[in-house]
């Protein structure tokens, strides 16, 4: 929570006791000494005689009470020898097996000592009114990069008049995987001089969302934005609709093409099918186009698709705008980043005066990848004791049969080794420790994105104890406002995307997450050097936390701060790196001195 103190009733009691003593002393010293003296003398004499008469009885009573207390202590240690050991270790190694006095689960905590120091540091920082330096980008060079994948000075694609056939894409996964698939399909269509049909989204047993492209993105805007780069239509011509793609050899699955395939592989394997049949259907299409080597015009086209052509439909924009206004408590125009995501819904009714006069709430968006599937698949341990191990093992057996088969054939890896190698998802407790080490005060608003956190309230307590202002879209929007999104997980994920991308600070716990990658790329592209992202290294953090029994808070702060600052260094996109995550390259952005 950051703030500590005593209950009001305790304070009142202490004050009344102090006032009573002061009043008594004033009464004694301010009274008539002669009158008071006779009273005191008589009282002291009577008390002295009474003590002499009953001295033996008093001594015997105290001796008997001492003996009974000693006997009780001895009997307790005989019949419950483990009580002392258990109570002393519970703060550091709390288990989800334990319950509180009211029947609720205790906090599952792995770093009780560090959490205690973090709480004290937050109180001290609040008293000093210190503000974290990580509300801003660490390096000024971030501001010299600007979006330019849609620049108009580039020549129009010369091959638009030629059409080698149609490309139909059925993308799998959730919102973010489908977004990548769409932009990869745009690049492939351009590469093969083909016409792209508006992509379709497959129904997933995991996401259980029937949404199609037009339910999430603006179709006409998508086609208009890319009209000078690739031909796009909403449907196949009638003479191709009736074809059996599998029978004629036009059905292409993940088994037919490499993950992150090169342009050469598409020309060698896919182009002949396209010329022969006039159509190719990519079924279950996803991350099937590599980043290097790739012609610069195709790389730029992927950036243009992701950062400019894919705009959410008005229903999502309007609710996203409402969500942001309720977090920030403002209703005026904001940054280029907000405009791109919210469109015309960026403006709203003013509260009082101009935008500058409104008290704005700054917030951190935190994407916790601590869902049960992620936790179970990692094979790590998270301080939850026997119940946690049993639950996760049962989940693995039910949901990951291939993983279980592989484990039977491979050498087991210890939980300690998994953690030290950076293969364990960060817990809510670890996220809280990182934020407190970076100087964010306990009154910071944190928007929590993602699905259900494994362990529920007991797992979240170490985070909410330090940062009580934790909010979700379900907290900020009414059931009526959320009703149009019910049973549409991808559309709900779009609201999280908006809240994370437009946040003052975006904190990720898993750099491999598609949401984290796409959001951090969006913030780099449109942020103008004013949209910092916190990327902790799981391996480095595990090394720091391994010293949790001995490390000082000052040392912990310094090492975590260095880790985050180094990750914010302004770098060009490296060879083979994703333009969806790292768009700082000459194909996507322009550098102005």
Positions of predicted regions on the chain:
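A donor-sugar binding/catalytic signature common to diverse glycosyltransferases
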Residues: 183, 203, 491-538
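Catalytic donor nucleotide-activated moiety binding site of glycosyltransferases and closely related
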Residues: 401-415, 442-486
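Leloir-type glycosyltransferase catalytic cores
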Residues: 6-9, 224, 534-593
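Secretory-pathway glycan-assembly enzymes, especially type II membrane glycosyltransferases
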Residues: 46, 52-70, 77-110, 117-422, ...
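Short, low-complexity, Lys/Arg-enriched N-terminal segments of secretory-pathway carbohydrate enzymes
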Residues: 1-54, 83-100
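Catalytic cores of eukaryotic secretory-pathway lumenal/extracellular enzymes that build
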Residues: 204-206, 210-222, 470-476, 487-489, ...
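Donor nucleotide-activated moiety binding/catalytic core segment of transferases
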Residues: 47-50, 417-433, 437, 470-503
């Amino acid at each position: 929570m950051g703030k500590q103190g005593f209950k009001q009733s305790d304070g009142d009691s202490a004050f009344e006791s102090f006032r009573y003593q002061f009043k008594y002393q004033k009464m004694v010293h301010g009274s008539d000494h002669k009158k008071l003296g006779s009273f005191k003398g008589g009282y002291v004499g009577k008390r002295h005689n009474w003590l002499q008469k009953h001295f033996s009885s008093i001594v015997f009573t105290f001796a008997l009470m001492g003996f009974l207390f000693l006997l009780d202590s001895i009997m307790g240690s005989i019949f419950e020898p483990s009580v002392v050991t258990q109570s002393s270790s519970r703060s550091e190694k709390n288990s989800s097996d334990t319950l509180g006095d009211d029947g609720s689960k205790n906090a599952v905590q792995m770093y009780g000592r560090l959490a205690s120091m973090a709480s004290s540091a937050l109180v001290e920082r609040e008293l000093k009114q210190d503000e974290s330096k990580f509300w801003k980008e660490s390096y000024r060079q971030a501001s010299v990069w600007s979006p330019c994948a849609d620049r108009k000075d580039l020549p129009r694609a010369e091959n638009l008049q030629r059409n080698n056939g149609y490309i139909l894409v059925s993308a799998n996964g959730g919102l973010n995987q489908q977004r990548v698939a769409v932009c990869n399909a745009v690049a492939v269509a351009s590469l093969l001089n083909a016409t792209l049909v508006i992509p379709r989204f497959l129904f997933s047993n995991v996401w259980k969302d029937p949404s199609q492209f037009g339910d999430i993105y603006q179709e006409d805007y998508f086609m208009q934005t890319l009209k000078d780069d690739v031909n796009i239509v909403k449907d196949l011509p009638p003479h191709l609709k009736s074809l059996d793609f599998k029978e004629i050899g036009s059905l292409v699955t993940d088994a037919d093409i490499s993950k992150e395939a090169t342009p050469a592989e598409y020309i060698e394997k896919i182009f002949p099918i396209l010329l022969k049949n006039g159509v190719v259907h990519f079924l279950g299409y996803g991350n099937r186009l590599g980043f290097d080597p790739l012609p610069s015009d195709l790389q730029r086209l992927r950036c243009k698709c992701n950062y400019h052509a894919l705009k959410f439909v008005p229903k999502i924009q309007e609710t996203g705008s409402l969500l942001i206004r309720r977090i920030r408590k403002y209703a005026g125009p904001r940054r280029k980043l907000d405009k791109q995501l919210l469109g015309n819904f960026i403006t709203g009714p003013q509260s009082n005066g101009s935008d500058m006069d409104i008290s704005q709430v700054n917030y951190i968006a935190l994407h916790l990848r601590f869902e049960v599937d992620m936790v179970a698949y990692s094979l790590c341990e998270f301080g939850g004791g026997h119940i946690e191990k049993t639950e996760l093992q049962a989940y693995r057996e039910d949901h990951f049969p291939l993983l279980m088969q592989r484990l039977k054939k491979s050498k087991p890896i210890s939980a300690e080794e998994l953690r030290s190698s950076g293969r364990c998802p960060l817990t809510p407790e670890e996220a809280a420790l990182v934020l407190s080490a970076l100087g964010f005060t306990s009154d910071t608003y944190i928007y929590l994105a993602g699905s259900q956190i494994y362990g529920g309230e007991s797992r979240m307590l170490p985070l909410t104890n330090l940062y009580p202002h934790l909010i979700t879209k379900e907290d900020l929007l009414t059931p009526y406002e959320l009703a149009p999104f019910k049973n549409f997980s991808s559309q709900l994920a779009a609201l999280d995307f908006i809240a994370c991308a437009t946040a003052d600070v975006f904190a990720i716990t898993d750099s491999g997450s598609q949401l984290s990658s796409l959001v951090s790329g969006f913030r780099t592209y449109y942020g103008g050097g004013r949209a910092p992202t916190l990327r902790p290294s799981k391996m480095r953090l595990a090394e720091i936390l391994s010293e949790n029994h001995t490390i000082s808070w000052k040392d912990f702060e310094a090492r975590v701060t260095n880790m985050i600052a180094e990750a914010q260094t302004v770098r060009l996109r490296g060879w083979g790196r994703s333009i969806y995550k790292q768009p700082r390259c000459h194909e996507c952005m322009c550098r102005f001195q």
